From Swiss-Prot:
It comes from Staphylococcus aureus (strain NCTC 8325 / PS 47). Its main location: membrane. Belongs to the ATPase C chain family. F(1)F(0) ATP synthase produces ATP from ADP in the presence of a proton or sodium gradient. F-type ATPases consist of two structural domains, F(1) containing the extramembraneous catalytic core and F(0) containing the membrane proton channel, linked together by a central stalk and a peripheral stalk. During catalysis, ATP synthesis in the catalytic domain of F(1) is coupled via a rotary mechanism of the central stalk subunits to proton translocation. Key component of the F(0) channel; it plays a direct role in translocation across the membrane. A homomeric c-ring of between 10-14 subunits forms the central stalk rotor element with the F(1) delta and epsilon subunits. The gene is atpE. One of its GO terms (molecular function) is proton-transporting ATP synthase activity, rotational mechanism. GO terms for biological process: proton motive force-driven ATP synthesis. GO terms for cellular component: plasma membrane; proton-transporting ATP synthase complex; proton-transporting two-sector ATPase complex, proton-transporting domain. This is ATP synthase subunit c. Keywords: ATP synthesis, Cell membrane, CF(0), Hydrogen ion transport, Ion transport, Lipid-binding, Membrane, Transmembrane, Transmembrane helix, Transport. F-type ATPases have 2 components, F(1) - the catalytic core - and F(0) - the membrane proton channel. F(1) has five subunits: alpha(3), beta(3), gamma(1), delta(1), epsilon(1). F(0) has three main subunits: a(1), b(2) and c(10-14). The alpha and beta chains form an alternating ring which encloses part of the gamma chain. F(1) is attached to F(0) by a central stalk formed by the gamma and epsilon chains, while a peripheral stalk is formed by the delta and b chains.
Length: 70
């Protein structure tokens, strides 16, 4: 049962991160298409957002390992 819980935790966190990253990058591309001069500022904000979104799957993997090991 712990193995199933760990797999679900990893899968859902990866799914959420994929959707979140897709939304962040698509909105950044739209912003650059509308205002090309703001490209540098938008890219910096995008990388911060992607980094924050990617932190969640890492936390999910850690929790899954703790669940599986415990």
């Amino acid at each position: 049962m712990n193995l199933i819980a760990a797999a679900i935790a990893i899968g859902l966190s990866a799914l959420g991160a994929g959707i979140g990253n897709g939304l962040i990058v698509s909105r950044t591309v739209e912003g650059v298409a509308r205002q090309p001069e703001a490209r540098g500022q938008l890219m910096g904000i995008m990388f911060i957002g992607v980094g924050l979104v990617e932190a969640l799957p890492i936390i999910g993997v850690v929790i899954a390992f703790m669940t599986f090991a415990g």
